[in-house]
Amino acid sequence: KEDNRVGIGAKALSGEGYKGHSFWDTETFIFPYFQMAEPEVARTLLEFRYKGLYGARKKAKENGYKGAMYPWEAAWISDGEVTPYITGVNVHTGEPLICLTGVIEQHITSDIIFALWQYYTATGDQDFMDRYGYEMIIETARFWNSRLEWIEENNRYEIRDVIGPDEYKEHVDNNAYTNYMAHENMRLAAQVIACIRDEKKDIYGKMQKLMQEEGTSLEQLEEELKDKMKKLYLPQPDEKTGIIPQFDGYFDLKEIDLSVYKNASVVGTIFHDYSGEDVQKMQAGKQADIVELLYQMEDITTPDNKAKNYVYYEARTLHDSSLSKAIHSITAC
């Protein structure tokens, strides 16, 4: 419990699945318990992520971004991204099977910061913030600040080519969960920059020095964050239906009856009948995505719209991940 050099593997102690790597599972699904019941363990988990800043900065740089881009799969604190890029071979074509989560499933960066802020709000642990928290928030916001794309024809910033929580949909634009969580990460950074400038001048000076080494400044970052937040596209509920699009073009996807797959005794049975490319073109999700967003940020729409989105997306979710039903159950309450 006291060793902040390691996190919690996705399968915990139940098996060797995922090689013991830490995913967003830690901050989003495991962390809330520790935050309330054993806050000292919650802090240790966040310290693990702080120690992983080296690897997160390394990943950002390797992908052409600034700041800290947390790995989708994390192992030792200095390793950076450890998600395998090739996971096997297509037995029909002989082509390698590519795993894109380590490259374009990027919401984990803001998931970590969301958990960090929840911890601070619940515990008031100022020592943690002074030692680690402010730096983590600012460095991850620098990533998002460099990640946003200005789309001239839409007159807004967007986040294109990602995987959201629903991993059956790859290379999507403006995944609602990703965009909202990135916006929150940026908002918190602008807030804490103002805070440390006024109240934590030593920390402000430390971070300013770090920015200057990168050829920028906290003032410039704060200004850019405030500007980009106002122009970042946040998908809104449809005026007629109240449904938030999971990503651009979601409502144009094919609809099929998923009941036979939802009621199967094992997961993944949809792939007995359809290829991954087929499922990519269907309103068929692996796990909570919009419902995950409504769980994390329940105030982004009205209770009536929230209920409509729950009904709409649950019918289109296969719950092929063990992370899905718990979130649906909580949100239903």
Regions found by a protein language model. Give the residues of each.
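Helix-terminus loop motifs that line ligand-binding clefts
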Residues: 2-14, 40-114, 120, 127-131, ...
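Short, histidine-centered active-site or binding-site loop motifs used for metal coordination
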Residues: 12, 28, 163
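Flexible loop/turn segments at secondary-structure boundaries
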Residues: 14-16, 52-53, 78-79, 121-122, ...
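Solvent-exposed loop and edge beta-strand segments that line ligand/cofactor-binding
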Residues: 14-24, 95-109, 166-179, 273-287, ...
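A structural signal for alpha-helical segments
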Residues: 17, 124-132, 170-173, 177, ...
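Active-site core of glycosidic bond-cleaving carbohydrate-active enzymes
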Residues: 22-53, 114, 187, 194, ...
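Acidic/histidine-rich catalytic neighborhood
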Residues: 89, 143-216
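Conserved functional hotspot residues or short segments at active or partner-binding sites
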Residues: 137
